Swiss-Prot record:
Main location: membrane
Domain of life according to the entry: Bacteria
InterPro entries according to UniProt: LysoPLipid__transptr_LplT (IPR023727), MFS (IPR011701), MFS_trans_sf (IPR036259)
Family the entry assigns: Belongs to the major facilitator superfamily. LplT (TC 2.A.1.42) family.
Reported function: Catalyzes the facilitated diffusion of 2-acyl-glycero-3-phosphoethanolamine (2-acyl-GPE) into the cell.
Membrane topology, from the record: Multi-pass membrane protein
Primary gene name: lplT
One MF term in the entry's GO annotations: lysophospholipid:sodium symporter activity
Organism of derivation: Serratia proteamaculans (strain 568)
One GO CC term on file: plasma membrane
Membrane-spanning parts: 16-36, 53-73, 91-111, 139-159, 163-183, 195-213, 227-247, 253-273, 286-306, 310-330, 344-364, 372-392
Locations listed in the record: Cell inner membrane
Assigned keywords, A-Z: Cell inner membrane, Cell membrane, Lipid transport, Membrane, Transmembrane, Transmembrane helix, Transport
Name of the protein in question: Lysophospholipid transporter LplT
């Protein structure tokens, strides 16, 4: 089966449904595994500052593999690349489940995730195009966030009950994702590789970086999404330490439920972006980005669970409205210049470098005993200022 799918097919085509289902299962496993592994390292009495180190090892794989994964995604059928990547995630989950070093196992999951990301987003541009691509990104983000919502909560609740059972569920879900990938049509390679030598691949990747960075629109998208996801992953770990201090709750489930509220909000915001923002009006999303930082600073001061839920829902809505148009812009312009897989690999490099830097600063702040509420306020203010600066620079460029 080697069809070239028409990009004018209905949005909810068989191919799109297969991609969305596979993505849901894979993202569910990622998020359940994170919270199950955090519970495991807490049980094994690792220090608090080691929690973000777990995620830093994960994102470091994205940075190291960035020159290679885009070419892999563009040189093979993307559905099969996604299947192999989910197989690597399954192997990492089994490493943790069978009692080996959790940092090693989670790093292996990171290798799978790094290979998976360019393929999962790049395939959207092969089965749809134009304004449908914004809507397809909305579906992808909604599927991902629904998986974050259910996976995070399931991981936290199962870990409170039985940590090994939680890890086993993650392995089963990854196995289901591998099977789901078999139903994605085998599409022709988008940009077959010229060379597979590491030097040539690295040179080609950095050439793609230069091409995208010189384009004002894609540079704008790269910076915006990098700031957003760097902030998002840091907020996740902030919640783990903030909940016991601000709310006096010490279980594993509450931080996952709070993260779930962000997920619900992103689904709503992604839907609003698909309705009100087009590729020609991407700058409409920028005020939402600034308000994310303001809302995070206000959130850090809360002392009641209801207010925390409400503010995190608002943060999620703003986040979905902010990031979906930027993703679509990069994919649309990137697929015509360097290939969708390479464009997403460059985006992953930026996003994960931002994550690594922000998590490193957060881990340092925790290690030197900066109050977690103060960390939250400072984090929100700096994010709002960064997005404001990005917006002003884009307006001046126009």
């Amino acid at each position: 089966m080697n069809p070239t799918l028409p990009t004018d097919s209905p949005l909810l085509s068989r191919s799109m449904i297969a991609v969305i289902c596979a993505q849901f299962l894979s993202a569910f496993g990622d998020n359940a595994l994170l919270f199950a592994t955090l519970a495991l390292i807490k049980q094994q009495l690792y220090p608090d500052w080691s929690q973000p180190i777990l995620q830093m090892a994960f994102v470091a794989t994205y940075i190291i593999l960035a020159p290679f994964v885009g070419q892999v995604a563009d040189s093979f059928a993307k559905g099969r690349v996604m299947m192999v990547a989910n197989g690597l995630k399954l192997a990492g989950a089994l490493v943790i489940c069978f009692g080996f070093n959790p940092f090693l196992g989670y790093t292996l999951v990171g290798v799978g995730a790094a290979a998976y990301s360019p393929a999962k987003y790049g395939i959207l541009g092969e089965i749809t195009s134009g304004e449908k691509l914004v809507k397809a990104n909305g579906l992808m983000e909604a599927s991902t966030i629904a998986a974050i919502l259910i996976g995070s909560v399931a991981g936290g609740i199962l870990a409170d009950w039985h940590i090994v059972a939680a890890l086993a569920v993650c392995a089963v879900v990854y196995a289901a994702a591998v099977i789901a990938n078999l139903y994605i049509p085998r599409l022709p390679a988008a940009h077959p590789a010229v060379s597979w030598t590491p030097r040539a691949m690295t040179q080609a990747f950095f050439n793609a970086c230069v091409v995208l960075w010189r384009d004002g629109q894609t540079r704008f998208s790269l910076i915006g999404t990098s700031l957003f996801w760097g902030a998002g992953v840091t907020l996740r770990f902030l919640l783990v330490l903030w909940v016991p201090v601000a709310l006096g709750i010490a279980d594993n489930a509450t931080p996952t439920l709070l993260n779930a509220m962000v997920a619900v909000g992103i689904v709503i915001g992604a839907g609003a972006a698909a309705r009100f923002v087009t590729l020609e009006t991407v700058r409409r999303c920028m005020p939402a980005g600034i308000l994310i930082g303001v809302a995070v600073a206000i959130f850090a001061l809360q002392t009641t669970l209801f207010n925390a839920y409400a503010l995190l829902l608002i943060i999620g809505v703003l986040g979905g409205f902010f990031v979906v148009p930027l993703n679509a812009l990069l994919q649309e312009r990137g697929k015509n210049s360097v290939g969708a897989g390479n464009a997403i690999a460059v985006q992953n490099l930026g996003e994960n470098t931002a994550m690594l830097l922000m998590l490193g600063l957060y881990s340092l702040a925790v290690k030197v005993s900066v109050p977690v509420v103060g960390v939250g306020i400072g984090f929100g203010v700096v994010f709002a200022l960064a997005i404001s600066a990005l917006w002003l620079s884009q307006r001046r460029a126009k």
